[in-house]
């Protein structure tokens, strides 16, 4: 688990986050054992006080299939798969007009690569939009939840 904040120069809190990470052996797709070289640059501190959402995002009933699209070069990161931020941008395409995002949650499931098809499903509920960005078999690459205050 990793907590972090973004603050102004005078210490006013602008944003805060909690994220869960797994260090992987990329060639095998399995968790890697951490070494001192992986951890020495990080300082452990107390868990921040905040509302901690569940790790998994629940898909609501009645998700509506949207127009599929193909992964393009501009979606890719240096590892040649879709950059995590791009999944958020894709999900934002399904926000209603004047929706003001207060909270974003993302669950990254598998890597999409150049040429893969993204088959989105979305559901707008009161104060919240949930988007599942799936492969052609309906398996999610990422699930994104955007909520208003």
Listing of model-derived features with the role each one plays in the protein:
Residues 20-22, 68-75, 107, 147:
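Generic structural detector for well-ordered beta-strands
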């Amino acid at each position: 688990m990793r907590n972090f904040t973004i603050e102004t120069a005078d210490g006013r809190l602008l944003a805060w986050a909690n994220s869960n990470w797994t260090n992987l052996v990329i060639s095998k797709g399995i968790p890697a054992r951490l070494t001192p070289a992986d951890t020495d640059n990080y300082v452990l501190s107390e868990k921040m006080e905040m509302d901690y959402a569940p790790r998994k995002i629940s898909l609501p009933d009645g998700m509506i299939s949207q127009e599929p699209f193909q992964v393009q070069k501009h979606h890719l990161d240096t590892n040649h798969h879709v950059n995590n931020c791009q999944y958020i941008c894709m999900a934002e395409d399904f926000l209603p007009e004047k929706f003001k995002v207060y909270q974003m949650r993302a669950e990254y499931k598998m890597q999409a690569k150049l040429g893969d098809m993204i088959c989105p499903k979305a559901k707008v509920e009161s104060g919240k939009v949930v988007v599942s960005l799936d492969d052609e078999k309906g398996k999610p690459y990422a699930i994104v939840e955007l909520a208003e205050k």
